[in-house]
Regions:
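Alpha-helical transmembrane segments of multipass membrane proteins
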Residues: 18-23, 49, 98-102, 124-128, ...
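Transmembrane helix-loop-helix hairpins at membrane boundaries of multipass inner-membrane proteins
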Residues: 1-6, 20-117, 192-200, 487-488
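Juxtamembrane/interfacial segments at transmembrane-helix boundaries in multi-pass membrane proteins
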Residues: 55-77, 176-231, 235, 260-278, ...
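C-terminal ends of transmembrane helices
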Residues: 19-27, 97-109, 151-160, 224-238, ...
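Alpha-helical multi-pass transmembrane bundles of energy-transducing inner-membrane proteins
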Residues: 27-32, 114-121, 125-208, 293-306, ...
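Predominantly late transmembrane helices and immediately cytosolic-facing juxtamembrane segments
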Residues: 227, 346-350, 416-449
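Structural signature of hydrophobic alpha-helical transmembrane segments
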Residues: 2-13, 82-93, 135-148, 209-222, ...
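Central hydrophobic cores of alpha-helical transmembrane segments in multi-pass inner-membrane proteins
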Residues: 8-24, 38-51, 92-104, 122-124, ...
Length: 498
């Protein structure tokens, strides 16, 4: 019975739980709010597990579909479904939300109910965006998740939180208005808002495709974010609380890249081929130049934020590598796998930074040193995540990057060679930070007073470590889910619409 409504449950359980948490009222009821938030996040995660276990790896198209009329007059419907790509993001989002609720358990003392509720509501909205089969429904969820994210940064962020949250809101909103225009144009062509109908349009002139490409691209590129519209991300990460940074890096950035896969590539294949060289150049700039920028950062959060931009450059590179008019198989699948891996690794890195910040209240690398002497268990976990961020084999960080590099070499050796620089830069800035923070003499007397991770922090880091190692040692479990959906997308993009 419930199998027919799994996606609706994945969307609405967190949202309803968020409303219930809000209803707990003042801070004096914080323990109740935390327990309700944990129950809601856990239920939201558990309901996504049948999506993975029950997913048919051999069949293409959408599964677990739901359809209900929403606004019949405008042919706008509540239509849901997941394919081999989106199903992984729904599960990842629910998983990270559970980790975020645990991460903020004892840390957030100011308005904890509202804090937990914002994450739960945002989780449901993000799941809605990943599962939507109606373009206007996607737009509502895609834009709606900005409101709780804006509040998370603006209320619980650092000293410059208002600046960071407003910058984030303006950047993303300006791009999204153009996407709305493009969606309305396409709806006139097919008489509705079904994304599959958009994808199955037989003929779109190249000039129109190019205009639509620009409209969609500006919206999704800001969300990824791609160079040069990336400047909001470091500010947002630095000011956001730990949970905000975890969700921002692990989930929110993936919405932009998912938009490329769901809208731009299948609906506008000729424009995608036309603009592919531009996307490749911008992606390589993100991989190489932003990697160099990360090398000179003194703030740990800002360093990992620039690292995220560099890794997401790898993702967009993999999505736009064409050979004889066809998308490269290895690169496309590698891009999706890299997104899932980055979700685990970036969340873990920001969790590690949050653990240290909670003890010393500074993110400056120079304020640390010798942490291994007082926090050996924490140092071991951070070593694993730092290695994964650098792309060490047997960790999840290696799999997607290796697949994209293999695909890039098939397209052009020099593109592959430049892309491979991310392995060098990733190791350089990540291990440089790790060495200065964890090893060496205790430079700050306050470091000597730091306590090792408690049971709650150990549990969060251990679960993330299992995810990073599990995906690195057995990536086939993820690749086989993505395989058929990626092949269907490649076949679709190969057909010209001119």
């Amino acid at each position: 019975m419930f199998s027919n409504y799994l996606l609706s449950l994945a969307i609405w359980i967190p949202i309803v739980a968020g409303v219930l948490v809000l209803a707990t009222g003042p801070d004096s009821r914080a323990p109740l709010a935390r327990v309700l938030a944990l129950i809601g996040a856990l239920a939201g995660f558990l309901v996504t597990l049948p999506l993975f276990t029950g997913f048919d790896r051999l069949s293409g198209g959408y599964q677990f579909t739901e359809f209900h009329e929403w606004i019949p007059l405008l042919r706008i419907n509540y239509s849901l479904g997941v394919d081999g790509i989106s199903v992984l993001f729904v599960i990842l989002n629910a998983f990270i939300t559970l980790m975020v609720v645990l991460a903020g358990w004892e840390v957030i003392q100011k308005r904890p109910a509202q804090y937990m509720a914002a994450f739960l509501i945002m989780s449901g909205l993000i799941n809605g965006a990943f599962a939507a089969r109606d373009a206007l429904l996607f737009y509502v969820f895609f834009e709606g998740m900005l409101i709780p994210l804006y509040l998370i940064i603006g209320v619980w962020g650092g000293p410059r939180r208002v600046y960071a949250s407003v910058k984030l809101f303006l950047y993303t909103l300006m791009g999204s208005l153009l996407m709305l225009v493009a969606i309305v144009y396409l709806s006139y062509q097919v008489g509705g808002f079904a994304i599959e109908d958009f994808q199955n349009i037989k003929q779109i002139p190249l000039g129109v495709q190019q205009l639509l490409f620009v409209a969609f691209f500006l919206s999704f590129a800001v969300k990824v974010p791609m160079f040069p519209v990336h400047t909001w991300l470091p500010d947002a990460h630095v000011e956001a609380p730990t949970g905000g940074s975890m969700v921002l890096a692990a989930i929110t950035l993936k919405l932009g890249a998912y938009g490329f896969l769901r809208f731009i590539l299948p609906i506008l294949p000729d424009a995608s081929r036309y603009f592919a060289p531009v996307i490749i150049v911008l992606s390589l700039i993100a991989v190489v130049y932003i990697g160099m920028v990360a090398l000179v950062q003194t703030d740990m959060k800002k360093l990992v934020a620039y690292s995220s931009i560099s890794h997401m450059g790898f993702v967009t590179l993999g999505m736009f590598l064409f050979i004889n008019g066809q998308l490269n198989d290895w690169a496309l699948k590698g891009a999706v796998i890299q997104m899932i891996s980055h979700g685990f690794v970036s969340a873990a890195m920001f969790m590690c930074i949050g653990v240290m910040y909670d003890r010393l209240h500074t993110r400056n690398i120079a304020d640390y040193g010798g942490v291994v002497n007082v926090m050996p268990k924490f140092a071991a976990f951070m070593m694993l995540f730092a290695m994964a961020n650098a792309g060490l084999p047997a960790t999840s960080g290696f799999v997607g990057e290796f697949m994209v590099i293999m695909g890039a070499v098939k397209v052009n050796f020099w593109v592959g060679a430049l892309a491979a620089l991310t392995l060098i830069y990733g190791a350089s800035y990540t291990l440089w930070m790790y060495k200065r923070v964890i090893f060496g003499a205790v430079g700050n007397p306050h470091v000597a007073d730091m306590k090792d991770i408690n049971c709650r922090e150990f549990a969060i880091l251990a679960i993330l470590a299992v995810a990073v190692l599990g995906m690195g040692l057995y990536p086939q479990a993820f690749i086989e889910v993505v395989h058929q959906a990626a092949n269907d997308l490649i076949a679709h993009v190969a057909q010209s619409k001119i």
